[in-house]
Amino acid sequence: MQQVPRPIYSTGLYAGAGELITITINDNTMGLTVIIGSHLDDLTDISPYLRLPVVTTSKQLFPGKNTIRNPLGGMIWIEKSKDVNGSADFVMEINGAYRSPDFIVGSTDVTAWVEQLRTTTVPWLELRGRHVAFSVQRERLLDMINDDPTIAEKMPNTLEAWDNAVETYYYNYYSLQVGAQDFSMRAPDFPERVVLDVELLDNLYIRNADYGVVALNTNYLLNELASYQTLKSGNSVAIFNALYRNYSFRDIKSPWWSEVSDAVKAIPLYRMAEKGLREDGYPMGPIFPEEGSSIAEQFPKALAYADTDSSRWFVSDIKSEVRPTYALASLVQLANYKDDDWAFYIELNRMIKDKISVDHSTSTYFFKALCDYFKEDFSPFFEHWGYSLTDEARSYASKYPLMDKAIWKYSPLAENPSSGVVDFPSNGYHYRHNRADWEIYALDANGSDNFNSGQSPDRLLDSDKSTGWTSYYNNDTSTPPLPYYLFIDMKETTDVNGVFLAGNNSDFAATKLIIETPVNQDIINDPLDENIVWREIVQIDSIAHPELPNIKSEGFYDFPSKEQVRYLRIKLPEPNRNDNWNETDMSRFRFRVQSFTEFGTFYYKP
């Protein structure tokens, strides 16, 4: 957690403006403080301000009689210090205060409460559950109830739903337990507080403070707190986001890589909305309001994307404004793999607690943890969603059998979400070789190094489709003549069933590749050695494979039969796909340039 809720007790009492409050402690207990006023923010730096900058008073309490007053009045809270000492069970008397019309889940009668709201003069109150305490303005709440009486009628359900949300989507999800002896695993002992205020620091409408969440006192935010339908339909967006900021791991321990990091923030809100859809029939809120579309609209599109047979590249295929929704769909699918019901995520969060840091520059940490948890290889799932995987991750996962369910067909909002999930056949799956130790050289027809600055051939082996190799070119005759060659040393003799290629969709896309290997696989010290006899394994061209010049993600090409090879040579003899270059224009020889982003080999398992 970023911030544990401060140990503040609600008293259900309110101090009148300027009126003397007497607090008597009939015990030798030390380490308590009384606070009058729930609006703890100091707005001195704001000018002009909408309320006085400091509106609370506080005072340490000692055994015996204590007095305090606040010229503006306010709720009465008691805060416990870390070094409090004395009896755990003692009597505290508070005199001179008014009873606040708080709603306390499990003990407040709705009818009597509404009547109290109408007759009391106390301006602020709390809505209290076991794990939440909301400080709200009586007048604004009463106006909302007058407009919609179900707000009051459903208040017990609303606070119970909030308690369940905090316990399930935050405590349990982050592997926290109420009363745990291990403090690293212990859920907060005090409720999550939300205080509505007329003005916030830094001109914000909501922020996380050391005593809870502070939000603007508006109908919109009060509705997020007090409306059962708003909560259960997943429309309490601001409050859920604030809670996520408090419970989520700091960036240094986050397991979430860039492709899904925005979606993760919405997991608690989505789970609440899905529950509301199932239990109450409420249409789900947009979850990502900034996208301008709903989950109900975008999820089917996301599932259709993942279910296609063509290769995918998530960050390139999906528009940035809807990526969070698409990514969320994939995370929900994983949560329900084999009816796991989010248990993997809970275990993941438990493991991270023991880590000093987590590398989330790629998906590798998350992917390995997922494979270890289910003892299955989830490469097909990542490929269907177009998520990048490193060779290291693929090699690690290959020790497990492939996942056996096509979970990318799971439809979260369907009446029977798993109805379309079928068995996933493992035969014919392309297992990719780990290229970590490979060496690669790019050469022109004259045997010279052949790559443009910053686009060396080793980028073909880095598992990153945003980088790649481009042969050298210039706007003059120094652009080298064809053919070009890529020479690869795999460092050991390897069973190979074919090759894959990615990112061959630029103006410089290759139109013909001839894959060759030496007749003799003895160690080669010089790939330019004229005594090496090369034999052709397969020829890949845009005539037999019309898709070749348009491959953005991976294209896979089988060898006629399995080969045992250590060395490969890729010969590029033809001009690129762009027919705008004119060879008679001697200042432009870019028709020769070749470029793609990934190259590797694959094999089949028996």
Predicted feature residues:
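Disordered, acidic Ser/Thr/Pro-rich linker "stalks" and the adjacent N-terminal cap
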Residues: 423-492, 504-509, 602-605
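Trp- and acidic/polar-enriched beta-sheet ligand-binding modules for extracellular glycan
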Residues: 481-483, 506-606
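Active-site-proximal alpha-helical
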Residues: 134, 296-394
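Extended, low-complexity, turn-rich repeat/linker tracts enriched in Gly/Pro/Ser/Thr and Asp/Glu
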Residues: 28-32, 84, 479, 503-511
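Extended extracellular/luminal ectodomain segments enriched in beta-structured repeat modules
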Residues: 16-22, 481-483, 491-498, 510, ...
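Exposed low-complexity, polar/acidic, P/S/T/G-rich flexible segments that act as propeptides
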Residues: 82-130, 577-606
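Catalytic cores of extracellular degradative/oxidative enzymes
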Residues: 113-115, 123-336
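Beta-strand-enriched, solvent-exposed domains that form extended recognition/catalytic surfaces
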Residues: 1-101
